[in-house]
């Protein structure tokens, strides 16, 4: 899906995995590279890095979540490390079917400020 129109209306930064448990945000000037998962992402060599402290909102994908706003990710820990000590608004996005009553989480897992599904906001 082409979402390039968003860049015309908002200042948007996209996540790029840059190392083990390391993720950074970059503006998108149209120059991309294919990552190891086959996903196009902004080329860190050609795009401006954005400090997480300069972001107004961070949209976080959820594999699963609970009503306490704890999320289950893909297991790499990238978002947990990136969001640690960040005061930026953290919004998770998921489908209601991904809600888990018995989600197990650990001390290093980051609680989100909101989780939005197609039916509810937590």
Tell where the protein language model's regions lie, with residue ranges.
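Short glycine-rich anion-binding loops that position phosphate/pyrophosphate groups of nucleotides
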Residues: 63-65
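Short Gly/Thr/Asp-enriched flexible loops that form oxyanion-binding sites at enzyme active sites
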Residues: 1-4, 69-80
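Surface-exposed, charge/polar-rich loops and edge strands
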Residues: 53-58, 67-70, 80-122
């Amino acid at each position: 899906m082409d979402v390039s129109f968003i860049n015309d209306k908002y200042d948007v930064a996209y996540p790029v995995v840059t190392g083990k448990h390391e993720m950074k945000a970059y503006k998108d000037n149209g120059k991309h590279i294919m990552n190891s998962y086959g996903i196009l992402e902004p080329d860190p060599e050609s795009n401006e890095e954005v400090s997480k402290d300069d972001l107004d909102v961070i949209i976080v994908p959820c594999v699963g979540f609970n009503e306490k706003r704890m999320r289950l990710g893909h297991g790499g820990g990238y978002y947990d490390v990136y969001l640690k000590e960040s005061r930026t608004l953290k919004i998770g996005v998921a489908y209601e079917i991904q809600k888990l009553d018995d989600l197990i989480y650990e001390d290093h897992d980051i609680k989100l400020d909101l989780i939005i599904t197609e039916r509810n906001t937590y």
